[in-house]
Amino acid sequence: MKVYLDMCSIQRPLDSQDDVRVATEAQAVLGVLRLCESGQVTLVGSDALLFELEKNPHPIRKDYAAVVLSNAAAFAVTDQRVETRARQFELTGMKPLDALHLASAVEAEADFFCTCDDRLLKRARAVETGRTRVVSPLELVAEVSR
């Protein structure tokens, strides 16, 4: 099973845990990452994730995300197919980087694309993603725990 976590999902465990939703999503992401580390789930990395990682001005968050992405056993290169699909997603109102993440997941044939971003979740569920299911961290942990 291949899973693509966007950067907000990867970073969720570092967010303030004062909100119940954030704390629950953080635990869900950590559970999925443990499955990736054990080889039960394949984490998909991408050029888009590396680009976003490099832009992060917070050293702790940047280092944490780099460690997470070092465990990616699959990788989506931003090629012509990814760029074309991302442009199609942008036409639906997705932000360019969000569209690039989703396109990377779809072209890498990830089973799941996971985001904590409610706006992206709604927009991504409205487009054709083939075999890639768009899920929240809580939905993802329920799926991978089966």
Which functions belong to the PLM regions below?
Residues D47-E52, L69-L91:
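Acidic catalytic patch
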